[in-house]
Amino acid sequence: MTENTEKGASVETPQVAGSQTNPPVQEPLALTKIPPIKVKSERPDAEVEAKLRAMNAKIKAEMVTLMRRSNSNELGNNDESGESESSASADDKKNIKPVKSSNEILAELFGVFNAAPPEELLDDNLFKKKKKVKKEKKDKKAKKKKTTKSDGECSDSEAEGKHKHKRKKHKHKDIRVKDKEKDRDRDKSKEKDRDRVTDKSKEKDRDRDRDRDKSKDKFTAAQAPSEKEKEKSESRKRSAVEPSSHSEKRERHEREKHRDWEREREREKEHERERVRSNNSFYNGQREADRLKGSESASTKSRQEQDLSDISLSDEESYLREKASNGRRRAHNSFYDEKEELSVSPKRNVRESNTRRNRKSRSRSRDLGIDKKRLLEIARRNAINMFKQGTMPGVANMTAEVKDKVLVKMRYGGRTIQDLTDFCKKISNGDGLSDLSSEEESDVDKNGNAKVFHHPFQLKEREPIVMHIRNSTALVPAPPRLDEQTKAITMQFPVSSGQTHRNNEVWVPVDPKDSLVPLPSLPPAKQATNMFKETPKNVFAKSIPLQEQQEPAFKPLGGAVVVPPLAATQLPTVPQSVPPTVPKEFAPPAVPFVPEVPIPSTSPVTPMQSASIFPDVTPPSMDVSSIITQRLSAIRRLQENPADSEALKMMYTAQRNMSSWANSKHLPGQFTGSTGAQVMKAHELNSGPQLWVRKDQMTSTKPVTGGMGMALLQKMGWKPGEGLGRCKTGSLQPLLLDVKLDKRGLVSRDDLRPPQMRAPAAQRRNKNMAGPIGAGPCPAVQGAGPGPLASTPLVTQDKHPVCVLNELTSKNKWMPPQYKLRQDIGPAHNRSFLFSVEINGQTFTPDRGSNNKKEAKLNAAALCLRSLGILPPS
């Protein structure tokens, strides 16, 4: 409400209120006695407000004609009453006469237009306020209750103090709280409108009676002041006499508000604790309570100590009771709390707050100290009993050592109940067994030796998957191949796929065990075959004793063949049964012998020939254990000092000795395996792209210059010079496709020929009476006349024989070629097909089959074209 300061002339004294017969005499007395004070000039009167509400309800409910009549009567009454009051009151009473408030003026202005003034304009608090401060819920409910009271029950000073009081602690409220309070205010205004509509009929009757009374009392209004003025004067007198009572009431009201705000804050904290307890475990809620205990004020602590009950429970009973209450309690939701607060009346809210306070004092405090160590021991004891009884999942598969480790960890390693719960979950899932001993963090391996390297991020080895199946025997995995087996296989098969071992054979002479007696001279063919068969003996180091017998293999063909002299000397040693004419019989074949396979010579190898691709490996002077020891010591020294030159030298020497030792154990040999080359078979070679498909078929075609294609492109909106496609980003030149999808009806430019003269009837009659096509060329080919084959030569370049044969028959107007399957033999994986083609009454059949039918038809068509002379002979 607006506050205006006025002089004491505007204040009514008891003398002025009591005697009205002689006002001019008492006016100076009042001015001298009462000092000037500050008062509230504009204050809502209860009777005026009730009248305003009645007028608004009547305006909304009555018809338009009744509204106009009532408004006219009301305006007439107001004018008459104003005139009577002005005529009856004297000049000195003008200072005492109450001025019309702004609310009354607004009500009269809106009454002319048959409308009710908005509540925002009737509220005088909005003119003086700079910031809109939200009140507490209880303040709003109390305000609503006071507005519903009868006239004169609420003092103006209390209402003014309530509006004037601003709390700075409400500045921390966020926007969501403000929105909720706006919604509540909107709902309350709707409820008020609903109440006004329900009381419409009652207020209508009251207004009619009041109008009759006004017409009767308009003559007596000039003689005596109304009761309204008396009450106004009394209230002003009380406010002037007792200015100190307002400050006391204001302070008392502020204290009550502060106390209510503390209770509301404490209630919100309890709701938050309940929400945390419902979501988290027991001890999480306990920790939260311990944190909040230190931050509360001293008054809250004393209040909580008074509220504690004398009933003492054991820690286990309290834990079970809290657990049961958490299970029964519904999860907190602020959405439902807001709806409940809107639906509850203010009286009920006040009553519930008192009962809630009393109920809270009877209940046990949530900050009650609980012996956590005792609860931890109880939980640990229960877990150990379950582990010993075997009821915990995963215990049956543990060994005795693992069980002992688990028991030790459960007895002495657990910190909280949550740790024990997590550890039991790990045991049931099989994940906790690897965490019993932290081997990856220690610097000692399983054997007790110091680790060379420490890996801080080393991954654990993946454990094998174990499936528990009843009545099943476990499959024993095959043992891995040992190093001895691998070494034996390497010694037996020393050569790999040929990448490391190259074919550089060196023949080493070997002394024969027994001197072999050479056989007599053999025929040349037999000699050649014998020498070819004896070559494996040379491979296995069984050389022929005579070196001269192998020398002719490396001489040129034109050279003279030297007869070995040893043969002549050994001829007498042959038994006499052999006829002497044997050398004469063997003399005629004097053709120089050239073996099909060159025979390696057994002559001593020169130093140039002894060059080997394998390095000469000298055996190391130390054993493997000393090499490894030297390498480990070098590694340790390098870890301490990476710039140690001696350690680097030792490392290099050990590495070189290790590689030389490994190479010495590697024995090279001849390649006896397979190169791994996958030679394709005939049917595999014939599969894939066919012969008549070219790689540049889609790129080296002719551009579109006209015809139907160009017409369609231009019809679709394409212009020469633009790119193809929707976004015009394609090729600038459209190309013709060189693929014929249909053999009939298509004519190319090469096939067009000028019109020919009609052949004579005799020639047309004898056109098809020629001899067999396969026997020789056709008459047209021989030049008998301008036949079809002679006039337009066929283009066979880059064309399939089947297509060429089809074009030939279509040009000569013959029957199309007929292909018939003549042969289909062979296994399922390697079939052999043979086709024959019939053209103009002649049949052509190739002499060999093919792996597929397309190739067989191709061979038949090619044979037909070769016989006609179109294709060159193969």
From Swiss-Prot:
Expressed in ovarian nurse cells (at protein level). One of its GO terms (molecular function) is double-stranded RNA binding. Residues 12-24 have a biased composition (Polar residues). Pfam families: dsrm (PF00035), G-patch (PF01585). Residues 705-751 form the G-patch domain. Residues 128-147, 162-175 have a biased composition (Basic residues). InterPro entries: dsRBD_dom (IPR014720), G_patch_dom (IPR000467), SON (IPR032922). Residues 70-89 have a biased composition (Low complexity). Residues 176-219, 226-277 have a biased composition (Basic and acidic residues). This is Protein Son. It comes from Drosophila melanogaster (Fruit fly).
